[in-house]
Regions:
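A compositional/biophysical signature of low hydrophobicity enriched in polar/charged and small residues
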Residues: 1-319
């Protein structure tokens, strides 16, 4: 992945910041090639060619719409299962489909320790604990970390019956245009566009990669700070040094934002170990940085059934 691919891929993130809400990273497919071209300094045609290349490689294969779990009165929890053999992952992926509430799993290498991060929804901590016990039974090692809450901003909208119908249509056909969605729901284009944009603006749902998309070769870098007050200066130094860096938003990785977070997080290219290690050394040398933590994404699996069933419960069947 060259710097231009990385810059274009970053431009698909709302505000240029990465967010991981209940699984894959958020993207904004509405961003026109013209706007991306202005950001990265190439022609519109050049952007389209690069996007087509990323699609052929599988990184932008399909799109999905994920509803906000708060719409259904549930929160997201995450637990990690240790992985000792690469062959264990495929079986765990299959078994997770049998666990109620599992919505996403990511195979990661976290500072040399391989583990499967399992995201699932739950009404409360006691239900989360029971699902954690089920996950332990699926673990080849018989181990799982205690489920912990994974913070996501709540939806700001109380959906109307029409909102549910629009959300249902968009979820079933994420590649459809707004006009096609409006026809499916049986409303005007103007009403369809207004409802569609309102759902996104109030965080009732968001766009992400399709379930069959390949994991982009990125590493999550978390920089521990000596003093939270150093956060802005460290972030500025990263930009001044010209390091390839996609900042993770404060509300983007499962931790409720605080006024002065004690770390800076970002995504960096990980397809070249040599380049990555060079970047890690530079991060560690930044004034105010006391720790560099790396997490690599090796693969993932989506489980959309739970969300699909909950949305369908709010949409009367047509006869």
């Amino acid at each position: 992945m060259d710097p231009l691919d990385f810059a274009i891929y970053r431009s698909l993130s709302p505000g240029g910041e990465a967010r991981f809400w209940a699984g894959r990273r958020l993207i904004d497919p509405r961003i026109p090639a013209r706007e991306i071209a202005e950001r990265v300094g190439v022609s519109e045609n050049g952007v389209r060619v690069r996007l087509q290349g990323l699609t052929r490689q599988g990184f932008l294969r399909g799109r999905s719409v994920i509803p906000n779990p708060s719409l259904f009165g549930v929160g997201v929890f995450v637990a990690e299962l240790p992985v000792h053999e690469a062959g264990e992952v495929a079986q765990i992926y299959r078994d997770l489909a049998l666990v109620e509430g599992v919505v996403f799993a990511r195979d990661t290498l976290d500072e040399g320790e391989r583990q499967l991060q399992v995201h699932f929804v739950s009404e409360n901590a006691s239900t989360a604990a029971r699902r954690g016990a089920l996950l332990r039974r699926l673990s080849p090692a018989g181990k799982v970390t205690p489920p912990r809450p994974y913070w996501i901003p709540a939806c700001e909208l109380e959906p109307s019956p029409l909102d549910w119908r629009v959300l249902h249509a968009v979820s079933l056909h994420p590649d459809a245009s707004i006009a096609e969605t409006a026809r499916t729901v049986g409303i005007s284009l103007k009403t369809g566009a207004r409802r569609y944009h309102q759902l996104l603006e109030t965080r009732a749902c968001w766009w992400t990669h399709g379930p069959d998309a390949e994991e982009f070769p990125l590493a999550l870098i978390r920089l521990g700070l000596r003093d939270p007050a150093d956060r802005e200066s460290v972030a500025r130094q990263i930009l001044d040094d010209g390091l390839a860096w996609m900042p993770v938003a404060n509300d983007g990785y499962g931790v409720e934002p605080v006024a002065e977070p004690g770390e800076v997080a970002g995504l960096v290219p990980a397809d070249s170990p040599t380049v990555l290690e060079r970047a890690v050394r530079k991060f560690g040398e930044l004034p105010g940085v006391v720790r560099v933590h790396r997490t690599f994404a090796l693969g993932s699996m989506s489980y959309p059934e739970w969300f699909a069933d909950r949305i369908a419960e709010h949409v009367p069947a047509r006869h």
